[in-house]
């Protein structure tokens, strides 16, 4: 049912996503996706939104042993990019995503979606911003 709705109505990016990705591209900053979604759906969603070309790598939970909040997906993403976790910034919208990136050693920026960070989660954050439009100056 969800797939039919997506095929019919499409899918929209979060506000500021295209502008952020365009800014990163202009600055020659590599972007990757580290998601709990499988590769087929990830490719489909990114293609439908028109942002697939901005990402050098797509890393999905099926490519690693343990999913978020384990650090596996971020450690693997960093390895695929040829970067150390300390050279990477993760943008996350969920507590499990924040914990995953933090445990891997990445700087983590949270853009809360359904869950606001509690005091413990805030300790893991480099920054917490209300929207993707607030990220470019942090990179």
Give the ranges of each region predicted by the language model.
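Metal-dependent phosphoesterase signature
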Residues: 1-19, 27
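Pocket-edge positions in alpha/beta enzyme catalytic cores
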Residues: 9-12, 34, 65-66
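Intrinsically disordered/low-complexity terminal segments and short unstructured peptides
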Residues: 4, 34-36
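Hydrophobic beta-strand core positions in alpha/beta domains
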Residues: 32-33, 110
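Asp-based, Mg2+/Mn2+-dependent phosphohydrolase catalytic module
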Residues: 22-25, 38-39, 43-139
């Amino acid at each position: 049912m969800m797939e039919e709705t997506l095929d019919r109505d499409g899918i929209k990016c979060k506000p500021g996503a295209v502008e952020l990705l365009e800014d990163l591209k202009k600055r020659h900053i590599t972007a990757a996706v580290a998601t709990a979604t499988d590769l087929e759906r990830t490719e489909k969603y990114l293609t439908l939104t028109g942002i697939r070309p901005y990402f050098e790598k797509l890393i999905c939970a099926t490519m690693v042993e343990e999913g978020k909040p384990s650090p596996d997906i971020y450690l693997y993403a960093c390895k695929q990019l040829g970067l150390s976790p300390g050279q990477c910034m993760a943008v996350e919208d969920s507590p499990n995503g924040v914990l995953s990136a933090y445990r891997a050693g990445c700087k983590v920026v949270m853009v809360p979606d359904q869950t606001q960070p509690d005091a413990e989660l805030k300790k893991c954050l480099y920054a917490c911003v209300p929207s993707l439009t607030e990220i470019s100056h942090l990179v």
